[in-house]
Amino acid sequence: MSGYGRFAYYYDRLTENVDYGKIASWCHELIEKYSSEHEVVLDLACGTGSLSEALARLDYDVVGVDLSEQMLEEAMDKRYDSGLNIQYLMQDMTELDLYGAVDAVVCVLDSINHLENEEAVRKAFESVSKYTCDGGLFIFDVNTVYKHRKILADNAFCYDLDGLFCAWQNELGDDDSVSIYLDFFEEQEDGSYCRFSEDFTERIYSDEFLTKLTADNGFELIGKFDGFEDKPVGDDTQRMLYVCRRLNRG
């Protein structure tokens, strides 16, 4: 993945369909139901901080971690406006270095799919396990093979926004990965347009691999859901949500 550069500035405008309040409420329901502690939540791969803000409004102390400096700049601008209790850290999710344990870790919106190989996923889970308190939750999701093959595939999308045009092209690989190429055309003051590009790849990690990885890192798998609601996983599930609880180290 090349990383989010200028794309970070437009990320929220291109993802206006994402209901962060709904995601936060579902995570809150799961934490209340399955975790003994409900105070500190780590928003892993927090991006521009929209979910961090929604979680903080539910009275959590939130730590947001992301590798992109540009994304975190957008997140901190939001925090300045809202005044919410959120701490942001620029770190790699495979090498977390937090100040202490957290009660829950939330890593959603296919952030795991962005990791470049299975070893990176292993390291990320090891890091999460290290900083999740006994009885705490690890909530994460992944895009499914169905979504990559049937929804994203080789499709193209266009976004015509005020002052910005974005052409989004997907390329499905033989391994069911999807390479995503973004071309932005940004309107200048003189009416001309400046072009810039971003690209990244989302990879598929099997349910068997992820389930084993949770157990290998001291987590009990509580359940799997179709997205952000109490709905069982089906053949046409696009986003699979895993809910895991950290076993006592004892």
Regions found by a protein language model. Name each.
Residues 42, 50-95:
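Class I SAM-dependent methyltransferase SAM/SAH-binding core
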Residues 201-250:
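C-terminal lobe and adjacent flexible extensions of AdoMet/dcAdoMet transferase-like proteins
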Residues 119, 139-211:
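SAM-dependent methyltransferase
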Residues 103-119:
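A short SAM/SAH-binding and catalytic strip from SAM-dependent methyltransferases
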Residues 122-134:
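A short glycine-rich, Lys/Arg-flanked "PGG" loop and its adjoining helix->strand segment in the class I
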Residues 1-45:
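Conserved class I S-adenosyl-L-methionine
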